[in-house]
Regions:
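An aromatic/glycine/proline-enriched structural segment found at the starts
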Residues: 2-19, 24, 167-169, 173-182, ...
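M16/MPP (pitrilysin/insulinase) zinc-metallopeptidase core fold and M16-derived inactive scaffolds
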Residues: 41, 46-110, 292-308, 319
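Short acidic/His-enriched helical or mixed secondary-structure segments at domain edges of catalytic enzymes
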Residues: 145-159, 245, 257, 304-305, ...
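A structural supersecondary motif
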Residues: 267-272, 290-333
């Protein structure tokens, strides 16, 4: 979507029904996009400001800067200090937070519909006008180091991080979002501020709002807030969705962290599909049947029939040009060989035999329910339209997505299984294994 857009132009992305579910987009000067979805039966609104920059975009000298910056933007602006930022929203019964992902960062708030002006003003102030002072950098450095320490104490988190590192090597998409102790200690104020001013531009930003709102009012509020910050200028031309990124080459291998844990944690998997691959719906059904719930093959075989683990599931992650398909299990260290054999056997059986009609039906049902039930509140609706506007060329309606799920055929599932599940495997393990050799698992 690289064509020039007329400043202030408004497009209806989805017509909705009976005044509900109407999704509209306005493009402002500088390429800032405002997307809203009407939910007239609720009394709340969710506001998100999405910036198309994530940990994947970091150069080696910036590792951890995206997440560091997310913290710093809440420390203060010329008009609000950290206490005033949080109190402005919490004092009206709302919530405010942010998160950093591999390919984007989001700042969001949820408030009563009557308090929409406050939420927009505070978030815009945070995103456009952070001071990023030396004092704040040093103060927040300690907070982030504590966050890394907390994360490192949870092996179920670390094993997923180790899997990504083994899968993608030392490329940016394989690095931890938080950075490392070493990289955080090396990041200085000047480097972070330069990163902020380079990437936090209107053409990379989407403001998404869902709830009991009028699109015109939202556009007016956003325009006023961004103009006050001097952040609206230039042609209304926004950055197109990314189609690739640095360092997404897949590797095969084993990564073992020897730790004296009571439970072993493992992820066995490979690369998945990109978020625009049409086969993603078939892979979603396959994933649901293989390890998506208590009725899935892996859960039944590993936990229900053999009692080898408490937690066992499969998952998919999708990025611009690659993805992940993984199987996670937490088990007693003495049971890991049995668990890995079951995982390999079930993957091989799916490739050789496909899924039964009953499994396909349950997999589709799980995907349908997960989609629809996940859109019952303003926050999830805001996230859906904001993320879709930032990373896709189009916004598929819920009915369109449901139709794509229902249209998945057994042959399509078989074809995607033969592709994805036959790719070179990668294994990450955390547990008391010393120099135990797991290389046979990935051959």
């Amino acid at each position: 979507m690289s064509e020039r857009i007329i400043e202030g132009s408004t497009t209806t992305l989805h017509p909705g029904k009976d005044g509900a579910g109407v999704v509209r987009r306005t493009v402002l000067p500088g390429g800032l996009r405002v997307v809203t979805e009407t939910m007239p039966t609720v009394r709340s609104v969710a506001v998100g400001m999405w910036v198309g920059i994530g940990s994947r975009d970091e150069a080696p000298e910036h590792m951890g800067a995206t997440h560091f910056l997310e913290h710093l933007l809440f420390k203060g602006t010329p008009t609000r200090d950290a206490m005033q930022i949080s109190a402005s929203i919490e004092g009206i019964g709302g919530e405010i937070n942010a998160f950093t992902a591999k390919e984007y960062t989001c700042y969001y708030a949820r408030v009563l519909d009557e308090d929409l002006p406050i939420a927009v003003d505070v978030l815009a102030d945070v995103v456009t006008s952070s001071l990023v002072t030396e004092e704040d950098v040093e103060s927040e450095r300690g907070v982030i180091l504590e966050e890394i320490a907390m994360h490192d104490d949870d092996p179920s988190d670390v094993v997923h991080e180790q899997f990504a590192a083994a899968l993608y090597g030392d490329s940016p998409i394989g690095r931890p979002i938080l950075g490392t102790v070493e990289s955080i200690n090396e990041l200085g104020r000047e480097r972070i501020a330069e990163y902020y001013h380079r990437y936090y531009r209107p053409r990379r930003t989407v403001v998404s709002v869902a709830g009991n709102v009028r699109h015109e009012e939202v556009v007016e509020l956003v325009t006023r807030a961004y103009e006050r910050a001097g952040a609206l200028s230039g042609p209304a031309e926004f950055a197109p969705p990314r189609t690739s990124g640095p360092g997404a080459d897949q590797r095969s291998g084993v990564r073992v962290l020897d730790r004296p844990t009571e439970q072993a944690n493992l992820v066995l998997g490979t690369t998945g599909l990109s978020r625009t691959d049409d086969r993603r719906f078939a892979l979603g059904v396959l994933n649901a049947a293989l390890g998506g719930g208590m009725s899935s093959r892996l859960f039944q075989e590993i936990r229900e029939k053999r009692g080898l683990a408490y937690s066992a599931y499969s998952y998919t992650s999708a990025y611009a040009d690659t993805g992940q398909f993984g199987i996670y299990v937490g088990c007693l260290p003495s049971k890991i060989d049995d668990v890995l054999k079951i995982c390999r056997d079930e993957v091989s059986r799916v490739v050789a035999e496909g899924l039964s009609a009953d499994e396909i039906m349950r997999g589709k049902g799980q995907m349908r329910g997960g989609l629809v039930l996940g859109l019952e509140d303003t926050g999830s609706r805001m996230s859906r339209i904001g993320k879709n506007e930032l990373v896709y060329d189009e916004l598929m309606s819920v009915d369109e997505v449901l139709a794509r799920i229902e249209a998945v055929t057994p042959d399509e599932i078989g074809e995607v299984a033969a592709d994805v599940l036959m790719r070179p495997l990668t294994l990450a393990v955390i547990g008391p294994y010393g120099d135990k050799d797991f290389t046979d698992v990935v051959r």
